[in-house]
């Protein structure tokens, strides 16, 4: 799953750069896609290991956490 997520993110960034989309929009899209992929993966893993009632909140939390971290990384803040 992580390899597929990385390939998807790279393809999306390449397509956005080739079409002339601004860098800030590309960065926001990158953060959103990374959060969706990691949140979905975490929700799936937690749902298999535990129950969907635990997996969905875990996926949402991980998605929000990754989105915030990627946005901070891109913006240069610590």
UniProtKB/Swiss-Prot annotation:
Signal peptide: 1-45
Sorted UniProt keywords: Signal
Family statement drawn from the similarity comment of this UniProt entry: To E.coli YkfL.
Name of the protein: Uncharacterized protein YpjK
Organism of origin: Escherichia coli (strain K12)
